[in-house]
A protein has these predicted regions:
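Conserved GNAT-fold acetyl-CoA-binding loop/helix
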Residues: 34-56
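Acyl-donor (CoA/ACP) binding surface of acyl/acetyltransferases
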Residues: 1-24, 30-32, 72-178
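A short helix-loop-beta-strand connector motif used in the catalytic cores of GNAT acetyltransferases and
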Residues: 57-70
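Sparse recognition of residues in long alpha-helices and their boundaries
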Residues: 42-43, 66, 162
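A general structural signal marking secondary-structure boundaries and capping sites
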Residues: 33-34, 61
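A generic secondary-structure signal
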Residues: 56-57, 121
Length: 178
């Protein structure tokens, strides 16, 4: 079992690196059709593909521009979600963040705390000037969560994402290190 990363512990959760023991859970989450709209997946992912993803996640964020973490509930060490930091560009000092919370653990503050910890890490350790998130228009829960964390809705890409016989607008939310 992986150990929490120093500085990645909140009141409800801690964040830790992905490990081989996470393969069944990540395979289940990545193949949940309810999550496909948010993450852009259009087909099931194999265990081999997820295995490669886990192996690649050990590389440094400066090398890959991304970092994937498991969200664990404090006390129980139960994995409740997956946090991804991506599109890290040191020259522009910005980073994107995305979160997936297991359906049994939503609306309990885990996603909000994970985004908060990731934002603090981006500002304090990576010296980012901004953190941003992409949210589809239908996802009002994520929009509210980001707004409550100080993110601002700064852009809309109309009819950006095709899903289930319709287009969805894509919203950009940004938070600056001020």
């Amino acid at each position: 079992m992986q150990t929490p990363i120093i500085g990645f512990t909140g009141q409800l959760i801690c964040l830790r690196a992905l490990g081989q023991e996470d393969l069944p859970l990540l395979h289940s989450w990545e193949n949940d059709p309810d999550g496909w709209l948010s993450n852009g997946t259009v087909n099931p992912l194999s265990k081999d593909f997820i295995q490669s993803y886990i192996s690649a996640s050990t590389r440094h964020i400066l090398e890959t521009g991304s970092m994937s973490l498991i969200i664990e509930k404090l006390g129980s060490k139960e994995a409740v979600g997956h946090l991804v930091l991506y599109d890290y560009t040191p020259i522009h000092r910005r980073l994107a963040v995305g979160v997936y919370i297991d359906s049994h653990h939503r609306m309990q503050g885990f996603g909000s705390e994970a985004i908060g910890l990731a934002t603090r890490y981006a500002f304090e350790k990576l010296r980012c000037d901004q953190v941003y998130a992409e949210v589809l228009a239908y996802n009002s829960h994520s929009q509210h969560m980001l707004s409550s964390l100080g993110f601002q809705h700064t852009a809309t890409l109309p009819r950006w994402h095709w899903w289930d016989s319709r287009y969805e607008d894509l919203y950009y939310y940004q938070k600056w290190n001020e």
